[in-house]
């Protein structure tokens, strides 16, 4: 459907209707849907209503509980061993079954809107996914879900049901309109519209003007012009018109707000107009008025289009609750109530629990089953009260009249309902061609929007081409001897290597988009082949440009065979290699699925195809039983093809007899173990294209069938599995008898005439805006006092968070005017961070710590040094009890939205992290967002108790219930544009605030029982202000309230007599040594539990070590000719470069993730960044030493180096130094760059330089003088030098060199490779120097560079 200023499709059809003209009101929408319904009835068109039934639905998961669930390295090893033993039927896995949904039975009727209520962790998401047929395959499901009697399964038509996730995953590069439009194309046209369209085609004559408008709309929607029309309608009803053409954005791109992203997530599925909708916590991030608007539109659609809707909301306000027809109350997986909304309170009243008159019914329903809250609603004799368990409620419901009431009142009789079977409509099925077109057009769009990435790659390959072409410049390139051919061989190999490396960027690009693909695969049925084929087709011109650029810049400059045919054939090989490379790394990303795993697989694959490709060690020197590996490496075919193309040219036909060859060209091919016949060129090229085809096919299967690696999961306690009701009483907020009282100083905060500006966005100039600055806060003044809880409220865009950031000193940009005083003295940020806490909305924590460890770390560094450790631990326990985290003490924090704590648990942890610092002033940004009513009440009780201790607390809050709103003492209300419109006390039952606004002429009076917060936000909206014809900011500045506040500001802005300004002698509570110890303790805890990172690198090190040992088996024991030296040089080269680079690449995501936490902790004044940096470096050392031990212990004896203590020591030492500088280099690049993608790109670019100038591809003696300085600036070259000379520098065996007399190994090293004894000590010293330099740069950049923008 469509509704906008103009409902215009791609084909130019326009349907401007009087009932869809902007703005789209509820009456407009109802009128449109009503006329559409009447039209269907006249034409006899209509889709079957869908009744959804649950029949004893049980969903179970096998989980590990207790400490064994914590993913430490030891637990991972034990768990893996148990899994293997269980597979061999030697033991059980010791997992425990946990029921997520327990025998849920019920009927969800069509043409009605059902509200699903329940606390986070109650099983709401699992139930909704079960209803939508989207359950994860790892879960065990019993019972069944049916649509009109037919069981839901994978063959159920996609258009029948839609699941809206609670997580907002979108392409940052697409606009809101493009995002919803793509979903529309993938979901297809609504079946009813198809039938209507067919009826209209057959209809003769025109009934009236309204029919004409409906007909034109339906035709446009049905016959290929309707995607924009459908999209526009959804955009309109969701209130997204203002941002429809704005990029969604992410942490790197400015985009829409969190609330707008949530609405885009809803629109993404709503646009398909399925028959059943299952929506999961869709009000998170939305204010109450926006939530009401959206729910009202959804109600009209459910009633007038006969849809079946089940929607879960966290904190539905009363006016929103009244829009629902039915309620399902889910507690710990059991349905406690399912029936009409109006009967819900009656049911609980029959059990002795009554909802108070001013209590939100939704809040009552969620609290009445809680052991902590239940007693307050008991209406019987207080002495006879006993806790009613969830099982008792559920059993009472099952035996009540309500289930039978629902059964008797469903939409049709059972027989009639079953006759309307749900059948797949072939006309609704989207053709493969249309799916491909939609995907391809989106990929073209993303390619354009990501053009900076491809421009960067083009610049990168241009720079590398210029380097390589000047390194192998034709004026220095001869073609008379085998040594000359060796130099050309190095240039050819380098071309293959760089083209292959260029394809590695596919890993990061693919990993970045996989979470969105998994979501769209699940909810849009996006097939893997559609995405992969689109990406593949668009990769062809990319390969053409990049390999064409490389070939054009290097071929004739280096001086390869001058024939144009040879030039084209050289290009074809590199093009095929580039395609193979992109396909390979795309495939590895698809099976790795996480950045760490994909980087590991990519590096392992690179090492394997590199080592087995025939250049590092020739085919003839491989063990006979390993030569099959040579033919499995794509490098083999690329290297053979480019070598054949070059060395079979006539200019290499100089007569030369060696190794059964007659020319120089044939000799180099024979010596290198390469093919010598021309027909192999085309075979090799064909095989490269074959590799590409195979990897693309495998990628399709991986995308289609592999599960998402981060399915949302929460921590499971053993108590939950046993359903221990006593666990619910933990954390009831009551003070313990041995309460620890930590001293703090009550402080007031005054801010006067605060103005905040940012530079005007460039996009605004397009609309004629000439101002250079955009003002976000306008002359805001106020005061926050000890013992007073203040609410900072306003509609979206009013500047609430901006004001908090300015007052807390968290803004990193913009221009601030005005004064801020603490206890009458000007605010100093250094001291303010010591006495304040800031609970950010984003809940940023280290994912690999437990809850208790997170609190220990915060308290360790933020409490005064004179607080003893036992006092600190007791205080932490009290805070955990206060915010109900005691039961989650040993739970992993995890990644937000993926693993670990749920959203509300993370929110409580955020508050606890600040409370353990015992601050005097606390700022809280949206502390109840994402929480259900009960969790929000717990949080606000915690806040209230904090205020009652004499602290100053300010909260921004979105959509508070009556109870939560009236727990505040004072209110600061702002309107859009950053202007203050009310500042003062709320009064009993919000009477002061209500009295103030009702005194303004034109303001509608509050309705009886209406939430004062919702009423206040409604009347203060821009639309309401315009309709009334007032400016609230002007009215406030003329009011007596304003002058009362001015007097308060003046009074609090003066210091109290006999007081001094805050002063803390040291900059931090703890000294530098304690900071280092605390940071190292935290990093050690996090690393020990980061099993993915550490297990991956240990396994990879072991696998690579075994591969090196097998491939280079005993090559160091005997040296007979030049090729034997090159083979040893190959293993040294591989040891010096690849494992170190693997460490660098898999470390970067870990450091990048912790850097975000660093910004929060640094802003809180917890520690010096130097302490953080030292801990980050130090924690890597033991894990790195283990890697070096594994590698050295395996590789050294297997490759046959001389077994002397001295030589083994030098080998191990250089490996330690190599690992160390690679590790530090990875950290340094993260600290120097704003994100991991740029850090990875920079690392790759530098790694190529290190690779080229390492002394393997071209020896130091052969490097042109203008590039020789790079060799001496290259740490990888030093490692190759040190390893090679320490092992072979004293070898005196005579070896054969083609075209030269016999010479000793030492003479060959000095003459050809430039390895001399006099430089050995220098090389060792340079290792220490580069490690010190990288460490210094890491410390410096982490201290002074901050890429967070607020």
Swiss-Prot record:
ATP 1 binds at residues 118-125. One of its GO terms (cellular component) is membrane. InterPro entries: AAA+_ATPase (IPR003593), ABC2_TM (IPR013525), ABC_transporter-like_ATP-bd (IPR003439), ABC_transporter-like_CS (IPR017871), ABCG_dom (IPR043926), ABCG_PDR_2 (IPR034003), P-loop_NTPase (IPR027417), PDR_assoc (IPR013581). It is a multi-pass membrane protein. The chain crosses the membrane at residues 453-473, 491-511, 523-543, 557-577, 597-617, 683-703, 1099-1119, 1126-1146, 1181-1201, 1208-1228, 1238-1258, 1269-1289, 1322-1342. PROSITE patterns: ABC_TRANSPORTER_1 (PS00211), ABC_TRANSPORTER_2 (PS50893). May be a general defense protein. Belongs to the ABC transporter superfamily. ABCG family. PDR (TC 3.A.1.205) subfamily. This is ABC transporter G family member 45.
């Amino acid at each position: 459907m469509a509704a906008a200023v103009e409902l215009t499709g791609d084909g130019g059809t326009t349907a401007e209707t009087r009932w869809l003209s902007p703005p789209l009101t509820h009456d407009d929408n109802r009128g449109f849907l009503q006329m559409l319904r009447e039209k269907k009835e006249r034409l006899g068109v209509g889709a079957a209503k869908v009744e959804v039934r649950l029949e004893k639905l049980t969903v179970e998961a096998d989980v590990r509980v207790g400490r064994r669930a914590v993913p430490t390295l030891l637990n991972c090893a034990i768990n893996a061993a148990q899994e293997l033993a269980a597979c061999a039927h030697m033991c059980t896995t010791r997992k425990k079954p946990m029921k997520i949904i327990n025998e849920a039975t019920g009927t969800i009727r069509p043409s009605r809107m059902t509200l699903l209520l329940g606390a986070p962790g109650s099983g709401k998401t699992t139930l909704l996914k079960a209803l939508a047929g989207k359950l994860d395959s790892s879960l065990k499901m019993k019972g069944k879900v049916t649509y009109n009697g037919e069981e839901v399964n994978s063959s159920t038509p996609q258009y029948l049901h839609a699941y809206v996730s609670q997580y907002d995953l979108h392409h940052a590069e697409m606009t809101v309109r493009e995002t919803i439009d793509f979903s529309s194309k993938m979901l297809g046209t609504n079946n009813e519209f198809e039938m209507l369209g067919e009826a209209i085609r057959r209809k003769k004559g025109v009934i009236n003007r309204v029919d004409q408008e409906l007909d034109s709309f339906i035709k446009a929607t049905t016959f290929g012009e309707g995607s924009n029309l459908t999209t526009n309608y959804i955009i309109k009803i969701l209130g997204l018109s203002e941002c429809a053409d704005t990029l969604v954005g992410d942490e790197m791109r400015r985009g829409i707000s969190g609330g707008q992203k949530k609405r885009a997530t809803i629109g993404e599925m709503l646009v398909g107009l399925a028959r059943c909708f299952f929506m999961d916590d869709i009000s998170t991030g939305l204010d109450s008025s926006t939530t009401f608007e959206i729910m009202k539109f959804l109600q009209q659609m459910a009633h007038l289009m006969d849809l079946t809707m089940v929607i879960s909301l966290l904190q539905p306000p009363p006016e929103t609750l009244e829009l629902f027809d039915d309620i399902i109350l889910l507690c710990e997986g059991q349905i406690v109530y399912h029936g009409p909304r109006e009967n819900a309170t009656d049911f609980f009243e029959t059990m002795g629990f009554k909802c108070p008159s001013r209590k939100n019914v939704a809040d009552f329903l969620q609290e009445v089953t809680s052991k902590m809250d239940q007693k307050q609603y008991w209406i019987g004799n207080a002495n006879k009260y006993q806790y009613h368990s969830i099982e008792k409620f559920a059993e009472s419901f099952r035996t009540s009249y309500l289930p039978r009431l629902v059964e008797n009142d469903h939409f049709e009789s059972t027989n009639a309902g079953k006759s309307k079977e749900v059948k797949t409509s072939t006309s609704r099925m989207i053709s493969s061609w249309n799916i491909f077109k939609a995907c391809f057009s989106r990929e073209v769009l993303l390619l354009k929007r990501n053009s900076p990435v491809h421009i960067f790659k083009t610049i990168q390959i241009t720079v590398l081409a210029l380097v390589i072409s000047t390194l192998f410049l034709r004026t220095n390139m001869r073609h008379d001897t085998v040594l000359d051919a060796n130099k050309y061989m190095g240039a050819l190999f380098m071309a293959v290597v760089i083209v292959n490396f260029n394809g590695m960027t596919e890993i990061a690009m693919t990993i970045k988009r996989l979470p969105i693909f998994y979501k769209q695969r699940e909810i849009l049925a996006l097939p893997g082949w559609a995405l992969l084929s689109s990406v593949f087709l668009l990769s062809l011109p990319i390969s053409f440009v990049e390999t064409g650029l490389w070939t054009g810049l290097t071929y004739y400059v280096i001086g390869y065979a001058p024939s144009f045919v040879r030039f084209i054939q050289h290009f074809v090989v590199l093009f095929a290699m580039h395609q193979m490379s992109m396909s390979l790394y795309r495939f590895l990303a698809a099976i790795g699925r996480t950045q760490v795993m994909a980087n590991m697989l990519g590096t392992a694959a690179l090492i394997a195809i590199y080592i087995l490709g025939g250049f590092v060690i020739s085919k003839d020197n491989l063990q006979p039983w390993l030569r099959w590996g040579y033919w499995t490496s794509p490098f083999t075919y690329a290297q053979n093809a480019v070598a054949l193309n070059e060395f079979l040219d006539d200019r290499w036909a100089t007569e030369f007899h060696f190794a059964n060859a007659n020319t120089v060209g044939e000799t180099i091919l024979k010596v290198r173990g390469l093919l010598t016949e021309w027909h192999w060129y085309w075979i090799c090229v064909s095989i490269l294209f074959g590799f590409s085809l195979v990897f693309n096919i495998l990628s399709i299967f991986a995308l289609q069938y592999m599960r998402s690696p981060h399915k949302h999961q929460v921590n499971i306690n053993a108590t939950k599995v046993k359903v221990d009701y006593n666990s619910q009483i933990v954390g009831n907020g009551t003070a313990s008898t041995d309460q620890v009282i930590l001293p703090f100083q009550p402080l007031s905060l005054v801010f006067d005439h605060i103005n905040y500006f940012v530079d005007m966005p460039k996009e605004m100039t397009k609309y004629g805006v000439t101002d250079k600055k955009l003002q976000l806060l306008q002359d805001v003044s106020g005061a926050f006092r000890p013992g007073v809880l203040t609410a900072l409220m306003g509609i979206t865009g009013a500047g609430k968070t901006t004001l908090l950031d300015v007052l807390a000193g968290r803004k990193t940009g913009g221009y601030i005017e005005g004064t801020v005083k603490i206890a009458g003295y000007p605010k100093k940020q250094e001291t303010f961070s010591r006495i304040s806490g800031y609970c950010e909305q984003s809940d940023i924590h280290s994912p690999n710590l437990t809850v208790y460890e997170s609190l220990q770390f915060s308290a360790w560094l933020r409490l005064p040094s004179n607080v003893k450790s036992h006092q600190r631990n007791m205080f932490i326990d009290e805070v955990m009890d206060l915010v109900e985290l005691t039961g989650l003490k040993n739970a992993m924090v995890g990644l937000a939205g993926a693993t670990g704590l749920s959203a509300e648990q993370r929110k409580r942890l955020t508050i606890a992290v600040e409370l353990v610092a015992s601050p005097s002033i606390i700022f809280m940004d949206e502390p109840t967002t994402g929480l259900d009513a009960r969790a929000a009440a717990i949080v606000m009780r915690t806040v209230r108790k904090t205020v009652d201790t004499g602290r100053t607390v300010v909260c921004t809050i979105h959509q508070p219930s009556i109870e939560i709103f009236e727990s505040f003492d004072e209110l600061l209300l702002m309107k859009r544009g950053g202007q203050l419109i009310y500042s003062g006390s709320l009064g009993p039952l919000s009477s002061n605030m209500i009295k103030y606004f009702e005194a303004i002429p034109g303001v509608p009076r509050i309705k009886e029982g209406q939430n004062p917060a919702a009423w206040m936000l409604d009347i203060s909206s821009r639309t309401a202000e315009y309709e009334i014809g007032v400016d609230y900011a002007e009215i406030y500045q003329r009011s007596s309230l304003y002058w009362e506040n001015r007097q308060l500001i003046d009074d609090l802005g003066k210091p109290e007599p006999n007081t001094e300004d805050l002063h803390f002698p040291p900059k931090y509570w703890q000294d530098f040594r304690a900071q280092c110890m605390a940071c190292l303790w935290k990093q050690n805890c996090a690393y020990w539990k980061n099993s993915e990172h550490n297990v991956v690198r240990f396994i990879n090190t072991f696998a690579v070590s075994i591969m090196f040992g097998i491939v280079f088996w005993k090559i160091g024991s005997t040296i007979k000719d030049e090729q034997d030296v090159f083979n040893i040089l190959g293993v040294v080269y591989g040891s010096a470069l690849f494992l170190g680079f693997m460490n660098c690449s898999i470390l970067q995501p870990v450091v990048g993730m912790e850097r975000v936490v660093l910004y929060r902790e640094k802003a809180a004044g917890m520690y010096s960044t130097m302490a953080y940096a030292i801990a980050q470096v130090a924690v890597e050392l033991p894990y790195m030493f283990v890697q070096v031990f594994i590698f050295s212990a395996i590789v050294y004896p297997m490759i046959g180096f001389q077994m002397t203590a001295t030589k083994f020591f030098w080998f191990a030492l250089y490996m330690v130094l190599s690992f160390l500088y690679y590790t530090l280099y990875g950290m340094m690049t993260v600290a120097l760059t704003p994100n991991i993608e740029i850090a990875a790109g920079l690392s790759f670019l530098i790694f190529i330089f290190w690779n080229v100038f390492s002394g393997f591809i071209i020896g130091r003696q052969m490097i042109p003088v203008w590039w020789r300085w790079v060799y001496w600036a290259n740490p990888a070259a030093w490692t190759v030098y040190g390893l090679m000379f320490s092992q072979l520098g004293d070898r005196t065996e005579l070896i054969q060199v083609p075209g030269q007399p016999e010479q000793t190994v030492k003479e060959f090293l000095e003459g050809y490779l430039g390895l001399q004894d006099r430089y050995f000590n220098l090389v060792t010293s340079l290792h220490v120097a580069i490690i010190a330099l990288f460490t210094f740069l890491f410390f410096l950049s982490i201290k002074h560079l901050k890429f967070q923008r607020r």
